[in-house]
Regions:
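An acidic-aromatic pocket/loop used at catalytic or ligand-binding sites
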Residues: 2-99
């Protein structure tokens, strides 16, 4: 089970990949009648394959099911990872919404 205490801001149990830096100014988080909506951003110099491999390995240990390469489902929530290359880095957008 994941033992790091570093989690993405706004998520109680979404670990931040080692070497990844959060971009907190862009984060949003609010509750709706159907559930919570959270968006957070982070930047890393790791490649897309390593990022996806990390989260496909870690998230199932936290109860998430892999739905697609960048989509995970748990209970009534969907977590999407949107990865964008930007020069030498990859920007990862973590989006959580009700199913």
């Amino acid at each position: 089970v994941w033992s790091s205490e570093k989690f993405i801001t706004g998520f109680s149990d979404l670990p931040i990949m080692p070497g990844m830096q959060e971009l907190p100014d862009a984060n949003i988080s609010f509750d709706t009648a159907s559930g919570r909506i959270v968006e957070a951003f982070a930047k890393t110099e790791q490649n897309v394959e390593k990022i996806l491999s990390f989260y496909k390995n870690v998230l199932p240990q936290l109860g998430w099911r892999v739905k697609k390469d960048t989509m995970f489902v748990r209970d009534t929530e969907i977590l999407n990872l949107d990865l964008r290359k930007e020069r030498d880095s990859v920007i990862v957008q973590f989006s959580l919404k009700p199913q």
